[in-house]
A protein has these predicted regions:
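Cell-wall glycan-active module
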Residues: 1-158, 223, 227-229, 256-308
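Short, functionally critical alpha-helical segments immediately adjacent to catalytic or ligand/cofactor-binding
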Residues: 147-168, 179-180, 214, 239-244, ...
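A short, structured beta-strand-centered segment in the mid-to-C-terminal lobe
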Residues: 195-209
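Substrate-binding/active-site groove segments that recognize
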Residues: 170-197, 212-220, 268-270, 295
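Active-site-proximal structural scaffolding
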Residues: 169-172, 236, 288
Length: 308
């Protein structure tokens, strides 16, 4: 099933499936061919390979909201170049001819025998960085506009969606920064535009909208909810945790109450190291504790990456 880091799609007849893992950098395509009487295994194989080629080509050329393929420059042709929509057909043919195509016999729910063919290919090793570069100008622009640390924005996007603009979670949260229409997106929109609006998934999938709102939400956490915190490092620890679990849970962890003034006082009396220790051990959800650590590690990486 799909997750923010993994895009799974089925064709209408459910006879083919593709899965793109944006975290691991793997693309898997599978097709199911009916094993009709009189069909030789050679015919079945040919049919399976043609269907695999078509499905693989479809995945490689799938457009992002900016109409560029989502996987642009992320698949190598094996000869030092990268695959474009123009070369995708030839590439798909080559992959199916040369890679290890897995074959297995299955019996479907209707009792009919079928053959499943699948193939897996790897993206280039720096696929995450390539996607990050695509949104870099916009992230820097909005970080500056909202007075927030861009390295933290990159780290949050990496952790939320691995820079998959079509990311969707079960919540559902949408897009690069995994915004929830009823909470984070709504809060951010009213922070910028001073009016209440429930935004559609379609709106949130568009990277410029998503980055604008995500950065605005980080800004509101940093400068409004946690604006009373004097130390920048401590305030960002609270902001990162708040992005994942909401400011109320952070305040409760720090001061036993959701009152932000009490939270600021509790935080201001301690060092950033103490704040980190409390949050990473006492936040109500293990997921948020892990999230804080991951985002901080990645923000160090992006801080040096942005200087390159």
């Amino acid at each position: 099933s799909s997750s923010p880091q993994k895009m799974v799609s089925y064709d209408d007849d459910l006879n083919s499936r593709s899965s793109v893992d944006f975290e691991k950098g793997e693309i898997e395509v599978e097709v199911i061919i009916e094993d009709t009487p009189g069909k030789t295994s050679q015919q079945s194989q040919e049919e399976g390979e043609i269907a695999l080629e078509k499905k693989l080509q479809k995945v490689i050329t799938l457009p992002a909201p900016d109409n560029q393929p989502i996987l642009k420059d992320q698949i190598a042709d094996g000869e030092g170049g990268s695959i474009s929509p123009k070369t995708s057909k030839v590439f798909a043919k080559k992959v199916v001819a040369t890679e290890a195509v897995q074959k297995s016999n299955i019996t479907a729910k209707d009792g009919k025998p079928r053959v499943k063919y699948s193939v897996t290919i790897k993206m280039v090793p720096n696929h995450i960085e390539i996607r990050a570069k695509r949104f870099k100008a916009n992230i820097l622009k909005q970080s500056k506009r909202f007075k927030i640390d861009p390295a933290i924005v990159f780290a949050i996007i990496h952790t939320e969606s691995s820079f998959n603009p079509k990311a969707r979670s079960h919540v559902p949260a949408y897009g690069l920064m995994q915004l929830v229409p009823k909470s984070g997106a709504r809060d951010a929109y009213s922070y910028i535009y001073k009016r209440d609006k429930l935004l559609s998934a379609q709106y949130l999938y568009i990277p410029v909208n998503n980055i604008e709102l995500g950065c605005a939400y980080i800004s509101k956490l940093r400068h409004v909810y946690f604006g009373g915190i004097k130390n920048d490092e401590s305030a960002y620890y609270c902001t990162i945790a708040g992005y994942n679990t909401g400011p109320g849970n952070v305040a409760k962890t720090m001061s036993g109450t959701t009152k932000l003034i009490a939270n600021a006082n509790a935080v201001n009396g301690k060092t950033p190291e103490q704040i980190f220790k409390i949050l990473s051990n006492k936040l109500p959800y293990v997921e948020t504790r892990k999230y804080l650590v991951k985002v901080l590690e990645r923000s160090n990486y992006y801080r040096s990456w942005l200087k390159m």
